[in-house]
């Protein structure tokens, strides 16, 4: 990917309110901290559900009743890492939880990220004629790391995004969605799930 420069204080904020699908499972240990993985189901206005992967420090999952599919509020940020195992998708997208609390109210799925376009946008039309632009946004975090977040833009926002060359800084607001697709592999078709930010608004910052 082309070298890009980002704003000094990029934003990466996620707010999810949904139903826990299953009890947390141990993921890994890093620098003496143990992390759990859990799945949150968040309903859209259309009635469709997004099943989103959450990574959380075990201190956040302790002391909360996690049985019988409770509703939870998760605040955090989107993280990405490359999967080099050769199994499943290469770019893994999760929500890194900063807080997890009980919730008793309406579902919520809101994302605000700022970063730079790091791959040439792809503009296209759906079979129903809707305009779409796919782009990848690089969002900086501490220690010179970056998260690469796939984004999908619609309509007039898609037209604007299609005109953004690599290095363009954007602020995108929308939701984190899950989408099933079929990947053709040497062993035959394989169903996979993609995670991407579906943009409601996108604003150029430079």
Question: PLM ranges: what are they?
Answer:
Residues 1-206:
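OB-fold and OB-like single-stranded nucleic-acid-recognition modules
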């Amino acid at each position: 990917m082309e070298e890009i420069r980002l704003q000094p204080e990029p934003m990466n904020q996620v707010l999810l309110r949904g139903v826990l699908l299953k009890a947390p499972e141990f993921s890994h240990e890093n620098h003496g901290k143990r992390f759990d993985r859990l799945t949150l189901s968040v309903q859209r206005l259309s009635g469709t559900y997004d099943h989103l992967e959450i990574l959380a420090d075990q201190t956040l999952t302790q002391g909360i009743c996690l049985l019988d599919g409770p509703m939870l509020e998760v605040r955090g940020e989107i993280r990405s890492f490359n999967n080099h195992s050769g199994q499943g998708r290469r770019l893994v997208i999760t929500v890194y939880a900063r807080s997890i609390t009980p919730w008793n109210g309406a579902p919520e799925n809101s994302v605000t990220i700022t970063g730079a376009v790091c791959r040439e946008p792809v503009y296209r039309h759906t079979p129903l004629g809707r305009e779409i632009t796919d782009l990848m946004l690089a969002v900086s975090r501490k220690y010179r790391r970056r998260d690469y977040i796939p984004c999908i833009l619609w309509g007039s926002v898609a037209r604007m995004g299609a005109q953004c060359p690599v290095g363009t800084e954007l602020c995108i607001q929308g939701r984190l969605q899950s989408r099933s697709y079929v990947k053709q592999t040497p062993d035959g078709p394989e169903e996979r799930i993609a995670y991407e930010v579906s943009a409601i608004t996108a604003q150029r910052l430079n």
